[in-house]
Amino acid sequence: MTIRSYKNLNLVRANIETESRQFIENKNYSIQSIGPMPGSRAGLRVVFTRPGVNLATVDIFYNGDGSTTIQYLTGANRSLGQELADHLFETINPAEFEQVNMVLQGFVETSVLPVLELSADESHIEFREHSRNAHTVVWKIISTSYQDELTVSLHITTGKLQIQGRPLSCYRVFTFNLAALLDLQGLEKVLIRQEDGKANIVQQEVARTYLQTVMADAYPHLHVTAEKLLVSGLCVKLAAPDLPDYCMLLYPELRTIEGVLKSKMSGLGMPVQQPAGFGTYFDKPAAHYILKPQFAATLRPEQINIISTAYTFFNVERHSLFHMETVVDASRMISDMARLMGKATRAWGIIKDLYIV
């Protein structure tokens, strides 16, 4: 029997309280209290029970490197506390137990810097140059909210880009922005988080034919980069690899929606510029974003609808992926291929509509 270690886990901090409450509710247990850890150490304390037994106390410590340690031995009911500890442990994508250490080829500093700068547009992401010599430049990417970090090293003489760290928020943001620059081999690596891709990828022409069928009349209008991303993603998706988590296989669709939506809006007199981004143009009166009246006034109803629908889908799925929070109609994990393909199919429809509306 394998003995679990509850130290230095790659738990998604934004989900810990929600997961704890849902576990206790589903078990018909009772919450005594949930709140910040007493004392100076960052974390969460969960105290709960069920009728006829002592209180269980679970302390969840937020470590300085972005990892989390669970301590369930504090309270009077250790066995009950371990139930919650095990539940939180099992929310971790098995691929996230290990550190990422992968190498991508074909990079120069002028191609890496824009990706770092675009990643830093996320409110919780910062990057800095850590070291530089004649052979290597090293950058550190840090999440100020989640405390995880990623080390990105450019080996100048070989053109190799090395990515090292935990596959948490910094990894997701950086590789999302990097995706448009990657060839099929590189995209496969970052999507399935393995140095040597284990998916038997589908041939590009097969994936391209599939994409032509999906896009129909919109296919000839696809931007070169958009077609590259979607075909590369389909090479992996259509191989149906057996993975513990499929959320990153939605990268190509989200990148494409972002690019096509920016292009469409710019053509309609709504350029999307940083730092404001898309937010300048949309209101959110309920669960969906809609174009503000002053920008919608000159557009046809079908244009307003698809632009609003596209941004709502992009914002919801991207926010969940980057910030790892619980969002309506989205979750951190896409646990099966059917769910992934459902989201991808919806994305393809949005991309098609953006081109033909």
Curated annotation (Swiss-Prot):
GO terms for molecular function: protein homodimerization activity; RNA endonuclease activity. It is an enzyme of class 3 (hydrolase). The keyword Nuclease applies. GO terms for biological process: defense response to virus; mRNA catabolic process; regulation of DNA-templated transcription; regulation of growth; single-species biofilm formation. Its main location: cytoplasm. It is found in: Cytoplasm. Its EC number is 3.1.-.-. Pfam families: RnlA-toxin_DBD, RnlA_toxin, RnlA_toxin_N. InterPro entries: RnlA/LsoA-toxin_DBD, RnlA_toxin_N, RnlA_toxin_NRD. Induction: Repressed by IscR. rnlA-rnlB forms an operon, the downstream rnlB also has its own promoter. Coiled coil: none annotated. Composed of 3 domains, the NTD (N-terminal domain, residues 1-90), NRD (N-repeated domain, residues 91-197) and DBD (Dmd-binding domain, residues 198-357). The DBD is responsible for dimerization, growth inhibition upon overexpression and recognition of T4 antitoxin Dmd (via residues 327-357) and antitoxin RnlB and subcellular location. Toxic component of a type II toxin-antitoxin (TA) system. A stable (half-life 27.6 minutes) endoribonuclease that in the absence of cognate antitoxin RnlB causes generalized RNA degradation. Degrades late enterobacteria phage T4 mRNAs, protecting the host against T4 reproduction. Activity is inhibited by cognate antitoxin RnlB and by enterobacteria phage T4 protein Dmd. Targets cyaA mRNA. Forms homodimer in solution. Forms a complex with cognate antitoxin RnlB and with enterobacteria phage T4 antitoxin Dmd. This is mRNA endoribonuclease toxin LS. The gene is rnlA.
